[in-house]
Structure formats: structure tokens, C-alpha cells
Amino acid sequence: MNKLALQGPLWLASDLHLGPATPATAEAFLGLLQAAADEASALLLPGDIFDAWIGDDVIRAAPPWLAAVLHGIRAAAGRIPVYLGRGNRDFLIGQELADALGAHLLPEPVLLETDYGRILLTHGDEYCTDDSAYQQFRAMVRNPQWQAQFLAKSIPERLAMAEQARGESQAANQAKSMEIMDVNPAAVEAALREADVDVLVHGHTHRPARHVLSVDGRKRERWVLPDWDCDHADPPRGGWLVIDRDGLQCFDLVEDED
């Protein structure tokens, strides 16, 4: 399994879903980047940083909203290590983007060796095994051959395909129960058992919480990262997780601003 040893306070945030229609969320994220650079020893972003990512070549002529976000990440990465994960919306994030930002690609899943101990980190969509239609889609778009064929298309073609896929996904999700789109308990237990860890951190489900469970007679924890929306949600929402020698603590974006 991929391993990553990091010391000091680690900040984690996911599911920002940044795009041209999320200026307030982007502004909040830029604030998080500055705060993390001041207070954290590393920042980890395990997936769905962007609402869509059609290939790293978009940075060569980035629209203003994206240029501002990339500038913020680059500035933070100049002060602390920044790790970019890939989610179900931005699975095409690649080495070109990481190199341009002075950041690192976050392997998935990854076993973090922290001051608090060993922690399993991943985006989380792989645990939603009850949603068979989504798992088929995930297997397709993670296939290197499919990715190569997609990236060979023009940017306008890729944008149109991404917009169509997003619309189909939203329509399909409206017909699915929340339980189907959540993680499967057996898949979570299997991951904890295989990694031999007591703590799992993931995003994806937009259901922030700390779950305590027992696996093989051991107390385990599953921490779910919050999603961000400061543009369309009322009240705005977002947050991040801090891992240090004392444990794990989740901070709410709105409460922190008050």
C-alpha cells in the first residue's frame, strides 16, 4: 500500500467542487490555503477539488477563476507541502498540474504515518459499492485507455462531454436513495482490516461525521470530510480536518469565520 510519512499538524479538505459558478467558495478556499500555509506542516486535498477537470492542459490558458485558484495553491505549495488527490469529478488531475503548482500527487488510497499514528486516507467513492452503476462508471473513467482517448479530444469536446456527464449524474442521483450513494459498511471494514489501521478518513459522500465502529473486536473510527458550498447553500458550508499528535479535530468554515 502507498505510504506517506508526515510530521506536525496536517490539514485536510476535500469536495470543494470549484468552478466558474463558485466564486465565494473559491474565496473561502483561498483563505484556507493562506491559513494552512501559516499553521500547518502540510495540506492534503483528497479529491473533488474541482467540480470538473478535463485535463491538465487547461492550465495553459486558464480562465480567471481557475488562474486565481491555481495561484493560491502555488503560493501555499511554496511554503508547505501540498498534496492533490483525485476524486470522482477531477480524476484527470495529473503530474503536469502538480509540477506547475509545485505540489505533489496524492496516491489513493494512502497510509498516512502521522504524529497521531497510522491513518488510511482516500477520496471514498470506492467504498460506495451498493451503487453498481456508479462503480461501472468509475472503472471506465479510471481506465488508462479511456483516459488517453478522452484527452486526445479537443478542449471544447471534452467540456461538452463533461457537462453531459454531470447532467446525467445529477439526474441519476435524484432517483437513487441516500443509502445507495453512501459507503458500504462491509467495504469500509474490509479497508480498515486490510490496512490494519484504526482510523479511516475520506470525503465524497458530503456527510461529515465521526463514526465509531468495532471491527474484529477493535474500536475503529471513520471520519468523513465536509463538502464546501459558499455560493448556493444557505447557510454556507465547508470545513477541514486537522490531524496532530493529540488526535483528529474537524473545524467548520462558518464557525471559524465568526
Curated annotation (Swiss-Prot):
Pfam families: Metallophos. Its main location: membrane. Keywords: Cell inner membrane, Cell membrane, Hydrolase, Lipid A biosynthesis, Lipid biosynthesis, Lipid metabolism, Manganese, Membrane, Metal-binding. GO terms for molecular function: manganese ion binding; UDP-2,3-diacylglucosamine hydrolase activity. GO terms for cellular component: cytoplasm; extrinsic component of plasma membrane. It catalyses: UDP-2-N,3-O-bis[(3R)-3-hydroxytetradecanoyl]-alpha-D-glucosamine + H2O = 2-N,3-O-bis[(3R)-3-hydroxytetradecanoyl]-alpha-D-glucosaminyl 1-phosphate + UMP + 2 H(+). Mn(2+) 2 binds at residues 48, 88, 123, 204. Its EC number is 3.6.1.54. It is found in: Cell inner membrane. GO terms for biological process: lipid A biosynthetic process. Substrate binds at residues 88-89, 131, 169, 173, 176, 204. Binds 2 Mn(2+) ions per subunit in a binuclear metal center. Pathway: Glycolipid biosynthesis; lipid IV(A) biosynthesis; lipid IV(A) from (3R)-3-hydroxytetradecanoyl-[acyl-carrier-protein] and UDP-N-acetyl-alpha-D-glucosamine: step 4/6. Its cofactor is Mn(2+). CDD domains: MPP_YbbF-LpxH. It is a peripheral membrane protein. Belongs to the LpxH family. This is UDP-2,3-diacylglucosamine hydrolase. It comes from Bordetella pertussis (strain Tohama I / ATCC BAA-589 / NCTC 13251). The lineage of its organism: Bacteria, Pseudomonadati, Pseudomonadota, Betaproteobacteria, Burkholderiales.
